[in-house]
Amino acid sequence: MIINNKKNNKNGQHQHITNEHPVRLSPPLEGLGEVSSLRHSPPFGGVGGGFSTVILAAGDFPTHVLPLHILRTAENLIVCDGALEDLLEYDIEPTAVVGDGDSLSEELKQRYAHIYHPISEQEFNDLTKATLFARSHLKMDASTHTRPRFCYLGATGKREDHTLGNISLMLYYYRQLAIDPVMVTDYGYFVAASGTTRFESFPGQQVSIFNATCKELSSNGLKWDIYPFSELWQGTLNEALSNEFTIQADGDYIIYRTHKI
């Protein structure tokens, strides 16, 4: 089964994020992504590489034009069951609905029975259940070992513990599931990264770095020098000086960047 929601797209295009792989330099794109070792990461704003899947969680529904554009034009849209009602208010149809079903009315379960995939186990939250479902239904490029690119929307807001958990899952998906995850909010976007990576940016863009496993951590192109942070707050509230910056690292970390518009 290949999940595909293209028939529901009126525009046929969607926002993209470039690939993030070690020792790679990608050409500049007006999308969203990274460059690592050196890998490349353009700013969010145009059309670049494609998303394998867009996953909508049941946090605050997007209101910013960029995540809404991604949502409306996604080819493969997997929705956590708790977000289905909000999605339908925007007249957007999902490719699949995933979850334990406790957030769905019987009417919606029957209406979407053909694409509803109940998963009752309790070890993972609905965001991870949706990710595992999408991951298992994608054809992978074994010859190039290309990571699929997943975009996460509606994954912040409402309960703060869910927000913190969902952000931390970006590294779990990156390391354990071999995908390139990007969490897009109304204010900016989070990406998981590893090793030395060059990130496209813009002057004045607000940047935060959250260290996970780095014992060596430095930067070029940011207003304030960084170091191997031992606390999450220590890498917040930095600023890009130009159209790109580079993180030199020997481990994993999460980067947050604000939208330009």
Description of each model-found segment:
Residues 51-111:
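N-terminal beta-strand-loop-alpha-helix module at the start
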